[in-house]
Amino acid sequence: FVYGIFTKSQDPMFVEIQGISEYDFVILDSEHGPYSVSQQQNNIRAALLRGLLPIVRVSELSENMIGKALDIGALGVQVPQIENAKQAKKAVKYARFYPYGERGVCRFVSAADYSAKDRNEYFKSSKDLLVILQLEGVQAISNLDEILDVEGIDIIFIGPYDLSQSLGVPGDIKNPKVLNAMINIVEKAKEKNIVVGTFTDDYEMVTKWKNMGVQYISYSTDSGMFYDYSRDVYNALRMCGEKEKKSLVLDSTLSNGGQVIDWKYSDKDIKFILDKLENSKIEFIEMGILNDTI
């Protein structure tokens, strides 16, 4: 199993941090990220510096975009929205040199060590690059068998969110329609000895897909992880110095004649709960403050 993160940031620092954290690969996202080619190249350099495998997700099936991503040093390309065998063959052709494809040739680029790399070795090296195809729609599912028969595919990557939209349940990636479609792709790809990958930001789903045989796991994004941590730290800061416990006393209208509930949340959270408790007189008791009715 290998693990990586989608990177949206233009700053190579975030790529370096992923390498220091010992992830296996990084997906530099040109489909939904704000990258220029030069920014991508700097992120690729940061990945290689820190022992990460740099993969570029291009914005579309494009000979120019795929070739350029590989010229600047990416060791793999991830191509979105593949729907049929014809598109799959084009992706392979654009990514590899003869005899595996027809990628445009320039030896004065990073991938060829700016012409220092032996030209024969440079041509041979394209067979070692990763070609990753994203299947994320009903058309891809309909044409799955013919796509999997295309030679030169290294990884099939299932895009759960676009797939959910295509199946009529947008965003509901745990819907049985989505899960069954994904399981079908995984099982058929495994029969062809093709590695399968997917995206998730849910540990429970990581376990599920690992047990199913998914080996290439992209967990969340750098921006998403930063938001999650930033939010958690902020919430912790708000609690610093506050009373650890606050109590709510329900009126004797309750069957047990009154009940104390220990609550470890902020005033805002308590007020929200109180608003939901209808037909009960509730008094707020805080250390040193009694019968202060909210």
Residue ranges and their predicted role:
Residues 64, 101, 237-294:
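Catalytic cores and adjacent flexible loops of soluble metabolic enzymes
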Residues 1-12, 54-59, 129-142, 195-200, ...:
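Active-site mouth loops of central-metabolism enzymes
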Residues 37-71, 93-101, 123-126, 174-197, ...:
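Alpha-helix-loop-beta-strand connector modules within alpha/beta enzyme cores
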Residues 5, 29, 77, 91, ...:
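Conserved, mostly hydrophobic/aromatic
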Residues 64, 74-151, 165:
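Conserved anion-binding
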